[in-house]
Amino acid sequence: MSFATSLPRPTTTGAAGFGLPLATCISLSVSHSFSPKFGICNNTSLRLKSKAGSGCYEGIHRSQLAASTILEGHTPINPEVESEKIRLIERIRLMFRSMDDGEISVSPYDTAWVALVEDIGGSGGPQFPTSLEWISNNQLDDGSWGDRKFVLYDRILNTLACVVALTTWKMHPNKCEKGLRFISDNIEKLADEDEELMPVGFEIALPSLIDLAKRLCIEIPDNSASIKNIYAKRDSKLKRIPMDLMHKKPTSLLFSLEGMEGLNWDKLLDFQSEGSFLSSPSSTAYALHHTKDELCLEYLLKAVKKFNGGVPNAYPVDMFEHLWSVDRLRRLGISRYFQVEIDECLDYVYRYWTNKGICWARNMCVQDSDDSSMGFRLLRLYGYDVSIDVFKQFEEGGQFCSIPGQMTHAITGMYNLYRASQLMFPQEHILADARNFTANLLHQKRVTNSIVDKWIITKDLPGEVAYALDVPFYASLPRLEARFFLEQYGGDDDVWIGKTLYRMLYVNCNTYLELAKLDYKHCQTVHQLEWNSMQTWYRECNLGEFGLSERSLLLAYYIAASTAFEPEKSSERLAWAITTILVETIMSQELSDEQKREFVDEFVNISIINNQNGGRYKPGNRLVEVLINTVTLMAEGRGTDQQLSNAWKNWLKTWEEGGDLGEAEARLLLHTIHLSSGLDESSFSHPKYQQLLEATSKVCHQLRLFQNLKANDAQGSTSRLVTVTTFQIEAGMQELVKLIFTKTLEDLTSATKQSFFNIARSFYYTAYCPADTIDSHINKVLFEKIV
């Protein structure tokens, strides 16, 4: 009796509400218990009625049927969930298509500086009355102005600026009184605030506003120790500001000109970018007040119109928005739905890319390492030609900074530089220096529990940094990264720190998070179905009798599912996992040279007979039978029997002769995956394919050697060899990264090239990650539910 008809076909509602027929994957005639450590269904009353060969054949066939059921869309899917997924995808596409100069929240502080500008036509009234209207309409219930997240620095600065603006134009005295009451009640509490949350230039901006307030006869308590401390910081910083230098070349000081005295505006106007000073509305408003410059006016008119009277703390922020939005889609594991939009984003960024790097907005005269690092990383990942020269101006004496001349080390800036450095090509020494510097700095911050950033208040920055340090780029399996980032990403709740707190609406977005969770749950449900079918195959092939553990079975499937994770890649995923399992099973057999030769000869001879006659000649060796049946089923309907048999024959010959099994296994996996994915056989002879095959198999050999040496190094006898091998691995991975992420005129598809990196990455992951860490990853990726 067929297992699919032996009992009724119950269904279970899996993750995301996907109704799934259990009988397509699970043999219901046996009982199971669940192992919480691995998520394994352990057999408790198993009685196999078939011999290994026929049972295995049917088990493989059922696994294939399960895969094809999923692949061809026969699995019932909750229509409401599917409709919601489509809606979210389309909504995000519309967001990307509408990207312009940046969707960013309004800053009351900057709006107040704009509102202070007097009509340059000489009427005596405000140049921007709608800015005053915005201020009057946006006071909070407690009398303050600011972001919905309460940070006292932000609230005090915004509130004082708005009170000064309204008082200047003798408007809304009741609102001013309410705002001053908030300031009076809270200003002394600044001493208790975390300095990492202090907005950019706060120690300059607040004293400037207090001085303005005094001229308007506004009483601000300024005798407290906290205010005196801020004034002391201002005086110290002003003494360090090279006033002569800032008039000679662009510096980051252009972002915070408001309130500064003794400025030579004729010289500073040469440093405008599209009318603004480093895209700062408040700085530009201050310049307009002093210069009546037409370009400043045009810039502010555009910004005020865009934001209905208000202005952000920076505008435009187009480079920032384009890059960070793409980064979020990638890390959440949903970038595959938006390839066209991502290409358009990166084409836009590359249009304004320079060998000195970029800033948060296009055509800026100052660059920063944070945006430059993110841009470098994403552009290199997508095959754009970018030079490492962008990092030169951020390095001095072996240390790296966020902005030239400022040796500050914001966590996120160093984190993104670290991530960029991991995409180094051979001989890119400055990236090696950057990786060492940032890794050490981030590690020190981690061990001292001081991962707090000056640029963003996010859900779990320590977790993001920990993942980057613990799972390097070479070992970061796509589904593993997505699973962790789903918990670390705060969506709409993440808030950035500039001159004031602000939101990047297309960077920190609940819509991304909603789609990512739906997508992950769907993939996880598919993977759990496949895993159940894999266990059935394992039992019916009696692989346990050959010494293969259920943990090895699970590890093989996890590696494949964490890399080729998309539901439509079932064939590749199962072929990858099954090939890995059979390789391990065969290698674990303790056979003499003669027995190995007999094993190989039997496989070769029967494969020839079966390929010629289209039959199923039964071998005498049970494991040979398992192998032949598996190859036959993997090739079914594809016409790749001969190619798969040849790939296995090559691996078996290497095994028989005691050759390099790491290299041979990599070649076998690549051929199997490519044949299973339907890659045209002509691609196998492509020069780039051969280059990638050689580089991948070489580094996989080194990784397998490292893994074996590390296992033997417990006695401390092979540490020198481990060091040498590690150096060779790093060199090999750099060469492979260059081959994969560099576009040539006659190139392979990016998906084909990526498959080589996927195999190398899987070897790297298993070689470097401890077993207990891998076990926790398996549980998290395959079995732990997304909340």
UniProtKB/Swiss-Prot annotation:
State its Enzyme Commission number(s).
5.5.1.28
User: EC class of this enzyme?
Assistant: isomerase
Listed binding positions for substrate are: K237, K454
What pH dependence of activity is documented?
Answer: Optimum pH is 7.0.
Which terms are listed as keywords in the entry?
Answer: Chloroplast, Isomerase, Magnesium, Metal-binding, Plastid, Transit peptide
What residue intervals hold the motif DXDD motif? 368-371
Q: Where, by tissue, is this protein expressed? A: Expressed in peltate glandular trichomes of leaves. Highly expressed in the first leaf pair.
Outcome of substituting A314V: No switch of product outcome
Q: Which GO terms describe its cellular component?
A: chloroplast
Please give the family membership noted in the entry.
Belongs to the terpene synthase family. Tpsc subfamily.
What name does this protein carry? (-)-kolavenyl diphosphate synthase, chloroplastic
- Source organism of this protein record: Salvia divinorum
